[in-house]
Amino acid sequence: MRNAGALVTEDVLRTLVLATYLLGVKRILIMPHTNCRMAMGEEADIHALIQKEHGVDTRSLEFRTVSDQRAALITDVNRVRSYPLLNDGVVVGGAIYDVTSGKITTVDC
């Protein structure tokens, strides 16, 4: 699954519950990437950019920008690991993908 910012939302958790029970998913990897637009500015900056370039006021939406990808990743991995409705025994890990080098760096969560 992919979403803006690679953040674990309620919808992501719902989907992971379904995946672990109905599809037999046994491993989950949360992996944001470098140069992510959601980690390159403040929420207000993104709203302003969309307004300026497209004339659309998006301030009613929360984009959930990330100021520290590593910290957000650790929080999200631990959130998934501790989610009570996930199937027992699911392994959850985290890594960051460097889009320039292609390197994947695991993160101890």
Regions found by a protein language model. Name each.
Residues 1, 30, 102:
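Divalent metal-coordination and catalytic microenvironments
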Residues 3-4, 33:
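Short strand-loop junctions, especially beta-strand C-caps/beta-turns
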Residues 5-11, 18-23, 37-109:
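Divalent-metal-activated hydrolytic enzyme cores
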Residues 24-33:
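Ordered, amphipathic secondary-structure segments that act as subunit-interaction surfaces
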